[in-house]
Amino acid sequence: MTYPNLLDRFLTYVKVNTRSDEHSTTTPSTQSQVDFATNVLIPEMKRVGLQNVYYLPNGFAIGTLPANDPSLTRKIGFISHMDTADFNAEGVNPQVIENYDGGVIELGNSGFKLDPADFKSLEKYPGQTLITTDGTTLLGADDKSGIAEIMTAIEYLTAHPEIKHCEIRVGFGPDEEIGVGANKFDAEDFDVDFAYTVDGGPLGELQYETFSAAGAELHFQGRNVHPGTAKGQMVNALQLAIDFHNQLPENDRPELTEGYQGFYHLMDVTGSVEEARASYIIRDFEKDAFEARKASMQSIADKMNEELGSDRVTLNLTDQYYNMKEVIEKDMTPITIAKAVMEDLGITPIIEPIRGGTDGSKISFMGIPTPNIFAGGENMHGRFEYVSLQTMERAVDTIIGIVAYKG
């Protein structure tokens, strides 16, 4: 189905810079997210028909569409995030390519282009309307496409009371891209049976498995002396960092893994002979494998300290989120419903693990099973990001189908 306000709504959203800041100590991490929620989203939530609309100190804008059929007793939530990834988001100037011809798309005057030879996903979209960047910023389809789709679904349901639906709760939140947005989510206040994050990629994505994730911070204490007299005295902290890294499995890196394979990812190394630091992220799907990865890093640190004769390697591990499959597989109702709705709409569900996490990873462990459905974005987090308007329309169709489902 086509929705006349969907495109303009999306374009309005992406032009607002809501980039999050991982170094911030506030919630939300940037004032621009507060302003976007209070000045743009809250008024529009009220305009499209949501009731009891409010903004919480945790950065979430919340609203409710009451059920219009007493036989539909479920309460279902839909959640998308306001922030965008760590890439230039100032001056977003989207291009709208109608009836895409399947060829190369020049991204404004930036010199960058979307070429099917480089981005095979473009082969799915001839004849569709694509929204791209101008090559100088990201687009923000992750996840403003999700926000626009949820808002449009509510608008349509309000205008069409003949479509019977259950109670719907909507939540637009901050800081998903920096991994802390759901930390303060109020599950008791949201009060639904289950929810969906509308934060996926291409048409048909339906996901209920995520990585389990941890961060590892390492400190290496060296001993600096003049290199001319260093033998037997110097301990090079940078060399310790190299030695530690070289004891990790050589092929367990993001660029060499796929599917259900986990990894260690070295994110940053800084330091000198005297002192060095390294930051890793650890990812795996199965709980035992996840715990084994953390234990392996600790074992390497312990072994190095034993060989060095002092505690020169310090490891701090912090769990970040867990595979929501552990929660959702106890009651697959949200997956069963979404799958049935997609199939009724002629959409082939793509049920694959997310090689990452969503707000739903944390919210699921707060007591609200929250799988993820497609929002349409491709090549997210950079200048080559784009989205199909037709895929966004199908996401709206899916949301409407879920809340009207009577099975």
Swiss-Prot record:
Cystine pairings recorded for this chain: none
Gene Ontology MF terms: metallopeptidase activity; tripeptide aminopeptidase activity; zinc ion binding
CC annotations in GO: cytosol
Active-site residues, Swiss-Prot/TrEMBL: 83, 176 (proton acceptor)
Pfam families, per database record: M20_dimer, Peptidase_M20
Keywords: Aminopeptidase, Cytoplasm, Hydrolase, Metal-binding, Metalloprotease, Protease, Zinc
EC number from the UniProt entry: 3.4.11.4
Residues the entry annotates as binding Zn(2+) 1: 81, 142, 199
GO terms for biological process, alphabetical: peptide catabolic process; proteolysis
Domain of life the protein comes from: Bacteria
Catalyses which reaction(s): Release of the N-terminal residue from a tripeptide
Subcellular location: Cytoplasm
Cofactors that this protein relies on: Zn(2+)
Cofactor binding note from Swiss-Prot or TrEMBL: Binds 2 Zn(2+) ions per subunit.
Family under the similarity heading: Belongs to the peptidase M20B family.
HAMAP family xrefs: Aminopeptidase_M20
Protein name: Peptidase T
Species name: Streptococcus pneumoniae serotype 4 (strain ATCC BAA-334 / TIGR4)
